[in-house]
Design a protein with these regions (language model features):
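Secretory/extracellular carbohydrate-interaction modules
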Residues: 76-150
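Short, aromatic/His-centered strand-loop micro-motif at the edge of beta-sheets
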Residues: 154-173
Length: 233
């Protein structure tokens, strides 16, 4: 992916629910209030928490401590638009990212973490699924979630579908569940355990998760992560 380039993708399917209509009679109201609503299913039900490993990608000419800190269970990662890429001579945008080393081709895989996006982070990807081995001419990513400096902090799929507003300066949980197959698989995105997006992936590939800041904008970008987990089934 070239510098200052973000792949676009079509709109996804947003989760929704049917409206519930109740009778206004006292008997019907009593019956309705007597039965509690069933709790929403946890997206990790039926999944197994699995260990994972990762390596770091950061500006090639800097120490990791110049762009990352870890304290109290929280990873802080930041980068500047003027920083060097992760490899000398590389043409991609600057980043400070965890590159997960649990590559996969098929099967069900879920990335899970609490995310905090400080105000002002604009144009940075904070989590993505990178297609490292893929058919020629196919996209480099299956999905990317980006932060933009609008609406109190807007999270978009690439630079298109709006998934969340008022995302700045607050913790929220993100889960990306990928049902990968030898053909076209399915990706589901959850915020605070509510489904916000369902889309197809980009077809067969070997891929891996990444999280941090991959900066396509200007100035400084930062993201924080805690309770990072990997699930399979």
């Amino acid at each position: 992916m070239k510098r200052r380039t973000v792949l676009r993708a079509g709109a996804g399917v947003l989760a929704g629910g049917a409206a519930l209509t109740l009778s206004h009679s006292p008997l019907a109201a009593a019956a309705a209030t007597a039965v509690p609503a069933a709790p929403a299913a946890d997206p990790t039900d039926g999944w197994t928490r699995t260990s994972f490993t990762y390596s770091w990608q950061k500006p090639w000419n800097l120490d990791l401590s110049d762009r990352h800190s870890y304290s109290g269970g929280v990873h802080r990662m930041w980068v500047y638009s003027t920083d060097e890429p992760f490899e000398e001579g590389n043409s991609t945008d600057p980043r400070t990212e965890m590159r997960w080393k649990n590559d996969y081709t098929t099967g069900d895989h879920m990335w899970d973490a609490d995310v905090y996006l400080p105000a002002g982070t604009d144009g940075a990807s904070f989590v993505q699924t990178l297609r490292t081995r893929r058919p020629s001419g196919t996209p480099a990513t299956d999905i990317m979630l980006n932060a933009y400096n609008t609406g109190g902090g807007t999270v978009r799929r690439y630079d298109g579908t709006v998934l969340k507003t008022n995302a700045y300066d607050t913790w929220f949980n993100v889960k990306i569940a990928h049902e990968a197959s030898s053909g076209t698989g399915t990706i589901k995105v959850y915020f605070d355990d509510s489904l916000v997006l369902t889309v197809d992936d980009r077809g067969p590939a070997t891929r891996y998760f990444k999280n941090g800041v991959y900066h396509h904008g200007s100035g400084r970008a930062e993201a924080r992560f805690r309770n990072i987990a990997y699930w399979t089934r």
